Regions:
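N-terminal secretory signal peptides that target proteins for export/translocation
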Residues: 1-5
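Subset of outer-membrane beta-barrel
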Residues: 26-355
Length: 355
């Protein structure tokens, strides 16, 4: 039974990857719709550079990034995450999980929201004639089960809805993940296919691509130091993810100032390689790892959002997490641009602890 399930799971994961390949030719901004589904679902992930698929504990928010992270430790967990995004945009995620022992599955349901607030409505002369509202929502359900003692499989199905004044659009997407977790060596490896799917309806009857993303991640908790180091590779379905601007010259790979170039083939290849990577680390301190310090670096964000000749911390992130009584509280900050960054707050608890 388990052998057959593993074969079906691997075949399904492969089908998702190859089905989505033709529609994922570009990741440049403006090329895909429902981009809000790519945002970090939690304060912890925000602090870790915006990507983390290789952790398996009781943090339910990880299931939004990798459904294979679902496990019995999340039974009865409720999480609420709110992101104070740029320009007063409000973004958040709320979810609940339940383990079903008879089936061997852990299920979860979640709601992601993005509220852009009121936007000025103007006529062809630029005269403001009113206000319009814009928002996006995604409903997610998913489940996971172990295939072996170390390998688990998970699947999410997501319905996305978008509203701009009287215009509406919808999309159906799926995530599939496999995770290998060796508890003895504290090593985890994972592969995830995210947002494979298509639009169901659009604003103007023109169907556009969803933000498909193939990710591979590894994490290792050190033996003699309470520290977990992770490397997450993203957008692996496309090698070249550089945005070449001939007006800019790149003098290096990791410099604090800005950025982008269409020259210097050797440096460009190295730079492009690192744009696929997110590096992060997490200190696990105190009894039961109740206090955590997190740092992250997202090279793609650094290179795309830095301003030439100005030093900034774009691409860097950090945060803390603490357990107080029955609650897990997380705070994350990510520097996006000289104009500012985002603050992410998360609260999680186990409902069964109150009854």
């Amino acid at each position: 039974m388990h052998t057959m399930l593993r074969k079906i799971s691997l075949a399904f994961l492969s089908a998702l990857i190859f089905q989505a390949q033709p529609v994922s030719a570009q990741i440049t901004g403006g090329q895909q719709v429902f981009q809000f589904m790519t945002l970090s679902p939690s304060a912890r992930i925000t602090a870790l550079g915006g990507a983390q698929i290789a952790v398996k504990d009781d943090d339910l928010a990880f299931a939004a990034a990798n459904p294979a992270a679902l496990n019995p430790q999340m039974d009865g967990m409720l999480t609420f995450q709110h992101n104070f995004f740029l320009t007063d945009i409000q973004h958040g995620y709320v979810a609940y999980a339940q383990h079903v022992p008879k089936l061997g599955f852990t299920f979860h349901g979640g709601l992601q929201y993005m509220n852009y607030g009121d936007i000025n409505q103007a006529d062809e002369y630029g005269t403001v004639i009113g206000k319009v509202k814009a928002s996006e929502t995604a409903f997610t359900v998913g489940g996971a089960r172990p295939l072996t003692d170390r390998i688990s499989l998970g699947l999410n199905v997501r319905l996305g809805l978008s509203t701009l004044d009287t215009y509406k659009a919808s999309a159906l997407a799926a995530d599939a993940g496999l995770m290998y977790a060796d508890t003895a060596s504290r090593f985890i490896a994972a592969v995830v296919v995210r947002n494979a799917g298509a639009q169901l309806s659009s604003y103007n009857e023109v169907r556009e691509d969803l933000p498909f993303d193939l990710q591979i991640g590894i994490s290792k908790q050190l033996r003699y130091l309470p520290f977990r180091l992770s490397i997450i590779a993203h957008h692996l379905q496309q090698w070249n993810i550089r945005h070449n601007d001939p007006n800019l010259q790149d003098d290096g790979i990791l410099q604090l100032g800005d950025t982008q170039s269409s020259t210097g083939g050797g440096n460009n290849a190295v730079d492009n390689f690192f744009r696929h990577l997110v590096f992060n680390g997490e200190f696990l301190l105190g009894r039961n790892e109740s206090f955590r310090i997190r740092v992250g670096y997202n090279h793609l964000r650094k290179k795309e959002l830095s301003v030439r000749n100005y030093r900034s911390l774009a691409g860097f992130s950090g945060g803390i997490g603490i357990r107080i009584s029955r609650f897990r509280i997380d705070l994350g900050y990510a520097a996006y641009h000289l104009a500012g960054g985002v603050v992410h707050l998360g609260i999680g608890t186990r409902l069964k602890d109150f009854f």
